[in-house]
């Protein structure tokens, strides 16, 4: 009788201890998912045949007062092929507006933007280069050529011009960023 009782007690102990471990594992997975760090990431697919430095400026105060305090730089290596540039925002950043600066090298060649993507957590906005001006204001000091067939935009460098090709967000981009950040 004692042996049967001890055996039954051991089986109960095993069954209940295994269930609590499964429950703890499920809780840990849920906790890890909710504690996953969300941060903004901007990606650009570009063709740049001269060395350059690109920047993404951002603000967190619903203005377009961009400063060097809120900027992410990315070195662009010269290549005739498409390269993807990643601009990873700080974890604490909560951008409301972004500005693209496509190079600070006055000796640069034309720049081709095939696409760009903004993502935050599991949400993203991806657009072809040819749709660039659906999201950004045109900068009259920079000439552009849009190739609808390729879905790209080319930013043309004027000889002797020292103008930096920078582009402010329009209302559509501001709304899209707000959707991403919710």
Q: Where are the predicted features?
A:
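Post-signal peptide N-terminal segment of mature Sec-exported envelope proteins
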Residues: 26-49
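Extracellular beta-strand ligand-recognition surfaces/modules
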Residues: 82-108
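Sec-dependent signal peptide recognition
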Residues: 2-9
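Extracellular carbohydrate recognition and processing domains
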Residues: 63-91, 135-137, 144-147
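Bacterial signal peptide processing site
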Residues: 19-22
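Noncatalytic modules at the cell exterior or secretory-pathway interfaces
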Residues: 37-43, 90-100, 149-151
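Short acidic/polar inter-strand loop motif in beta-rich domains
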Residues: 104-112, 117-125
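C-terminal motif of bacterial Sec signal peptides marking the signal peptidase cleavage site
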Residues: 14-17
